[in-house]
């Protein structure tokens, strides 16, 4: 697409939107300005291509399409069938998976589809066979009650939150924690690395239905072959949530034992983050679970979002291009440059570095909480997010860590030299930030003190760093 075409498309769109609700158009313009001027280091964020973004803004939004390709509950879905089939084809080819389901609206929806597919395969189907019933509607009230009780009495083993796991992996505040009896595995307290022997021991003791791999804040590769062996040893279904690192799998930065697709029974992902697509989810699996996953609607989902599936098809097609392999490699190289730069300047990193797209800074060495550090960095034009670290003394709200990631800045074209310079900016801000005090004189976990001159200086340096790497350079909104 030419630059003139992109600018014309977005100017026209904002003109149409602004004629109805100018405040929305102004917010869209302001968001582009903010993203252009900030060092975006949130590991779960990226920049989708103009083609991907434009694919979401069309009349597919008007169409209901409950069901699956060729088997809809509504007439007139032939064009939705086209884009869903294309998105699924690209996902299968990109990841080397026998089956792909691209309807989930988000990562948690993808996880819920996977959870219930496993429950349907492992618990519901045997119960139907025992009752000589073809469908749950054919069960007696007594059999249905017994099945519901059995479905709600299953176990899941996943990574603990403070070790880098995700809320949707069976933790009580999330619906997954109300579905499963969950137990966590953690990391070695000295190295911060996954303790695979500890995982095996926990699996033997707990005997989970699902062993769940994947993370949102673990800065190292995971050996999925070992986890599959552990799952097999206790008869568990091995599930992997690769939402954070799917782009590294697609781009062949993770291969062999570190590629989850050949090893897991079922894999879930988002389509944004390192995949650089629209906000959405997908599920990959083999033929043994495909029929159950294909029942995502009505099992978990209602109508899909056809406009987002169209954008998924575009983004997944982009990820199949040869240059995406280079992109994935540069994400990792940039993350390692950022981590090395931080450590050379005295920052403490969980696990002492990174193998993937993110690093986790222990900010207690600066005398700060994660919340204080996050806001001080934001004041200085550096966007991060606070994150718990293993055995975090400040809990999940204030935290003791800052998570930084490189997918977005890599998309903009920054390289290892710029990421080393970014490490200097981060260190400067954190070194000049101090805890604030509460009204009663006690030390605050939220308030902080940062000289505005330091924030302004670093903010200008961050802006200068980005000058040579414009975001959406072809788009001029005037």
Curated annotation (Swiss-Prot):
One Pfam family cited in the UniProt record for this chain: SHMT
Catalytic activity: (6R)-5,10-methylene-5,6,7,8-tetrahydrofolate + glycine + H2O = (6S)-5,6,7,8-tetrahydrofolate + L-serine
EC number(s) on file: 2.1.2.1
Binding site for (6S)-5,6,7,8-tetrahydrofolate: 161, 165-167, 291
Metabolic or biological pathway: One-carbon metabolism; tetrahydrofolate interconversion; Amino-acid biosynthesis; glycine biosynthesis; glycine from L-serine: step 1/1
Cellular component GO terms, alphabetical: cytosol
Membrane-spanning residues: none
Gene3D superfamilies: Aspartate Aminotransferase, domain 1 (3.90.1150.10), Type I PLP-dependent aspartate aminotransferase-like (Major domain) (3.40.640.10)
Domain of life of the native organism: Bacteria
Entry-annotated residues carrying N6-(pyridoxal phosphate)lysine: 273
Site (Plays an important role in substrate specificity): 272
Chief localisation class: cytoplasm
Co-factor requirement: pyridoxal 5'-phosphate
Name of the top EC class for this enzyme: transferase
HAMAP family cross-referenced by the UniProt entry: SHMT
UniProt function note: Catalyzes the reversible interconversion of serine and glycine with tetrahydrofolate (THF) serving as the one-carbon carrier. This reaction serves as the major source of one-carbon groups required for the biosynthesis of purines, thymidylate, methionine, and other important biomolecules. Also exhibits THF-independent aldolase activity toward beta-hydroxyamino acids, producing glycine and aldehydes, via a retro-aldol mechanism.
Record-linked NCBIfam families: PRK00011.1, PRK13580.1
Assigned protein family: Belongs to the SHMT family.
Record-given protein name: Serine hydroxymethyltransferase
Name of encoding gene: glyA
């Amino acid at each position: 697409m030419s630059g003139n075409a992109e600018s014309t498309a977005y100017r026209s769109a904002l003109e149409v939107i602004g004629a109805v609700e100018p405040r929305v158009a102004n917010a869209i313009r302001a968001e582009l300005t903010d993203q252009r001027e900030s060092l975006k280091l949130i590991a779960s964020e990226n920049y989708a291509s103009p083609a991907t973004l434009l694919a979401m803004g069309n009349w597919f939004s008007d169409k209901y399409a409950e069901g699956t390709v060729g088997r809809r509950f509504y007439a007139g879905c032939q064009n939705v069938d086209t884009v869903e089939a294309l998105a699924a084809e690209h996902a299968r080819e990109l990841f080397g998976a026998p089956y792909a389901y691209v309807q989930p609206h988000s990562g948690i929806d993808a996880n819920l589809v996977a959870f219930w597919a496993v429950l349907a395969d492992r618990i519901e189907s045997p119960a139907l066979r025992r009752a000589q019933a073809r469908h749950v509607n054919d069960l007696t009230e007594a059999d249905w009650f017994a099945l519901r009780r059995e479905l709600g009495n299953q176990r899941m083993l996943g990574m603990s939150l403070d070790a880098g796991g995700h809320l949707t992996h069976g933790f009580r505040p999330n619906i997954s924690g109300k579905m499963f009896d969950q137990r966590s595995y953690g990391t070695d307290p000295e190295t911060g690395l996954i303790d695979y022997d500890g995982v095996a021991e926990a699996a033997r003791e707990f005997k989970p239905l699902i062993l769940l791999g994947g993370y949102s804040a673990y800065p190292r590769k995971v050996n999925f072959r070992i986890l599959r062996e552990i799952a097999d040893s206790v008869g568990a279904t091995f599930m992997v949530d690769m939402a954070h690192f799917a782009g590294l799998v697609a781009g062949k930065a993770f291969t062999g034992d570190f590629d989850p697709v050949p090893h897991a029974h079922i894999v879930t992902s988002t389509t944004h983050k390192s995949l650089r697509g629209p906000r959405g989810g997908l599920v990959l699996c083999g033929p043994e679970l495909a029929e159950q996953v294909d029942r995502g609607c009505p099992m978990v989902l209602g109508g899909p979002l056809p406009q987002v599936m169209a954008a998924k098809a575009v983004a997944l097609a982009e990820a199949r291009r040869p240059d995406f392999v280079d992109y994935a490699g540069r994400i990792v190289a940039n993350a390692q440059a950022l981590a090395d730069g931080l450590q050379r300047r005295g920052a403490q990193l969980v696990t002492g570095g990174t193998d993937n797209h993110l690093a986790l800074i222990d900010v207690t060495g600066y005398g700060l909480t994660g919340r204080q550090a996050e806001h001080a960095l934001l004041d200085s034009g550096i966007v991060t997010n606070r994150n718990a670290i293993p055995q975090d003394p400040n809990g999940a709200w204030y935290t003791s860590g800052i998570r930084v990631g490189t997918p977005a800045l890599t998309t903009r074209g920054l390289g290892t030299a710029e990421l080393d310079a970014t490490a200097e900016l981060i260190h400067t801000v954190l070194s000049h930030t101090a805890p604030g005090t509460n009204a009663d004189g006690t030390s605050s976990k939220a308030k902080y003190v940062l000289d505005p001159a330091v924030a302004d200086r670093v903010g200008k340096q961050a802006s200068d760093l980005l000058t040579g790497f414009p975001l959406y350079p072809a788009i001029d909104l005037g």
